[in-house]
Amino acid sequence: MKKVYAAMGTDILHHGHINIIGTARRFGDITIGLMTDKALANYKRLPLLSYEQRKKIIENVKGVVKVVPQDTLDYTANLRKIKPDYVVHGTDWRTGDQKEIRAKVIELLKEWGGKIIEPEYTKDVSATMLINQLNSIGTTPELRLSKLRKLIELKPIVRILEVHNGLTGRIVETAKVNEDGSMREFDGMWVSSLTDSTSRGKPDIELVDLTSRLHTIDQIFDAT
């Protein structure tokens, strides 16, 4: 039986993932390279479910023979170990952040005659989009604190930038750098009364009244 490899990092399984697995199943036995918690935290976002929980879900999908950890966005270690006949991925990685990863996979597969299978990317759905929709419902201080603890646990560096108006909030929210196939972005924002005071031309002794502080926070919420 031919060997098929597909990488996934999801904790919300949707029909796009099922399409990928369904395509892969036609070519042989599927091994899923499931991104670890640390890999996901450094690439996309904090996972909602732990690696073991996500692994249990994927293992029970029809056609999946094995689930192995993928510690980075780079496929190299797992592909050299498994030497699959096929790697399956949606067409979305032909452009954007994963373009370089795709090129590297193609070169690697040439070493043993492997091929890439690229089913059409399922549009209008993604795990990130679904999670953002859930987050839009609201959050609590307890949830934010739990998320911060998990960030500190999983990431070697947690990137927090000070914000003091809507523009700086937008910078934190949208600034991204693609470095060696890995996305770098800010994890959160911090509102400093000291900087808020200085940005208003006042002494750097946090001399800003509560109404002004709330107005600043309202500006940030409105822009982000």
Locations of regions flagged by a protein language model:
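Nucleotidyltransferase catalytic core that binds NTPs
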Residues: M1-L143
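Active-site beta-loop-alpha junctions enriched in small/polar residues
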Residues: G9, M35-D37, Y121, E162-G169, ...
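Surface-exposed amphipathic alpha-helices with a cationic face
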Residues: N19-T31, K110, R149-I152, E173, ...
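Generic structural signal for well-ordered alpha-helices
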Residues: I21, K55, L145, G166-G169, ...
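Hydrophobic faces of well-ordered beta-strands that scaffold small-molecule active sites
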Residues: I32, R159-N165, D187-V191, T224
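N-terminal amphipathic alpha-helix/helix-capping segment at the start of soluble metabolic enzymes
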Residues: L130, G138-V177
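N-terminal glycine-rich anion-binding loops that anchor highly charged ligand groups
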Residues: V172-T198
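Alpha-helix-loop-beta-strand connector modules within alpha/beta enzyme cores
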Residues: P203-T224
